[in-house]
Amino acid sequence: MYATEAGGFAPEVEAELRKMEACDLMIWQFPLWWFGLPGILKGWADRVFAMGRTYGGERFYENGVFKGKRALLSLTTGGPEAVYQRGGRNGDIHAILRPIQRGILRFTGWDVLKPNIVYAPVRISDEQRQASLNAWAERLRGIEKERPVEVGEY
């Protein structure tokens, strides 16, 4: 809060804040790591999503600082899709992503788009990998037409 009030963010944090404020669409590309964000991305979020600047007071969810901006998660997993289903060994992937999609992104006002998930890319064939990349490229070409998804409640 002090950095927000005093304008005292470290230059690299201020630069990241300005990037978020300027963008229309933010994409986080990462491997799912211990059912969450990799440490470096979690650390980035902890530093950059600063109280007073990106949320606070009545500025959250539909009244959030980033209202009207869109965000999506693009991630890879270590296991196949079957283990990330409700009742699967690792649980429902959407429940796993909820703390990120709702607790960080939607909380600060972002409209969250459907995540792009590639399951176990190290275990799929070159043809499957290429098909996944092609589908992602095609999706990105039409991303401006996508509607936000409901990220669920706790």
Please identify what each model-predicted range represents.
Residues V83, G87-Y154:
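Glycine-rich phosphate/pyrophosphate-binding loop and the adjoining helix
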Residues G7-Q101:
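Helix-loop-strand module that forms the ligand-binding subsite of alpha/beta enzymes
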Residues M1-A6:
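Aromatic- and Gly/Pro-rich amphipathic surface segment
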